[in-house]
Amino acid sequence: MINFPQHPRQTLELAGFLPEASGRAVEWLISDSQVPYSEAVAAMDSRAAAIAAGDANELVWLLEHPPLYTSGTSGQAADLLDPRFPLHATGRGGQLTYHGPGQRVAYVMLDLKRRRPDVRAYVAALEQWIIATLEAFNVRGERREDRVGVWVARPDKGVGHEDKIAAIGVRLKRWVSLHGIAINVEPDLGHFAAIVPCGISDPRYGVTSLVDLGLPVTMTDVDLALRASFTTIFGATVNASGSEPAAGSVNSSSV
């Protein structure tokens, strides 16, 4: 069992996630077409095992899924209000969420043994990565102690209203991270209405996207910002070969 330090994520020192001096750059891969969820998880698990064994480089894999819902280890069946899309049980932390076109999913496979074996600080580092990415578009993303993910204030909706713009869910195997983050660029936000997102039913807390906030942002814009902000927290990246990680079955590119 992993023991979590009992201190706020805002106060965690995020230094220490850069790799060892002798470490290789993180491979960076972008899939051009939608990737079925089961295929992505199988490829991610395989790559993580290879990283743990020292047989593969760390990897960040950016992709989009076809419409689906995933349930984390704390997911509740009652939170699926309308099963309009397939539901996948997954080993990541958290509850129910939606994935689909227009949402940038980043699966992050890092060896925390050679960085910093601290799960809570790693989640905070992922949040900071998202916050720094949003800053490139003049969007103020914020973390909340009682709600993992990144939020934006919505005073236009009323006092105390906030919308979630990015979700985080992680799992570790032999201190190699799996799963990662999902940023809403231009998904169909109506699909979130079929679930209680992340188990949060308070009507003050909704879901938004960059386009919903009025920004003419493309997926390529977000990918470039993600890569630039990633290097400041986790270190250098290098373009991955097009055949990884899904055994040649996924069309891919690097930017």
UniProtKB/Swiss-Prot annotation:
Domain BPL/LPL catalytic residue range list: 54-238
Keywords: Acyltransferase, Cytoplasm, Transferase
GO MF annotation: an example: lipoyl(octanoyl) transferase activity
Pfam name, any one: LplA-B_cat
Name of the encoding gene: lipB
Pathway given in the UniProt record: Protein modification; protein lipoylation via endogenous pathway; protein N(6)-(lipoyl)lysine from octanoyl-[acyl-carrier-protein]: step 1/2
Catalytic site: C198
Protein name, entry field: Octanoyltransferase
Annotated localization: Cytoplasm
GO biological process: protein modification process
HAMAP family attached to this UniProt entry: LipB
Task performed by this protein: Catalyzes the transfer of endogenously produced octanoic acid from octanoyl-acyl-carrier-protein onto the lipoyl domains of lipoate-dependent enzymes. Lipoyl-ACP can also act as a substrate although octanoyl-ACP is likely to be the physiological substrate.
Main location: cytoplasm
Annotated positions for site Lowers pKa of active site Cys: K164
UniProt miscellaneous comment: In the reaction, the free carboxyl group of octanoic acid is attached via an amide linkage to the epsilon-amino group of a specific lysine residue of lipoyl domains of lipoate-dependent enzymes.
Organism lineage string: Bacteria, Pseudomonadati, Pseudomonadota, Alphaproteobacteria, Hyphomicrobiales
Catalytic activity field: octanoyl-[ACP] + L-lysyl-[protein] = N(6)-octanoyl-L-lysyl-[protein] + holo-[ACP] + H(+)
Record-listed E.C. numbers: 2.3.1.181
InterPro entries referenced in this protein's UniProt entry, alphabetically: aa-tRNA-synth_II/BPL/LPL, BPL_LPL_catalytic, Octanoyltransferase, Octanoyltransferase_CS
Amino acids binding substrate: R92, G93, G94, Q95, L96, T97, Y98, H99, A167, I168, G169, G180, I181, A182
Family label: Belongs to the LipB family.
Cellular component GO terms, alphabetical: cytoplasm
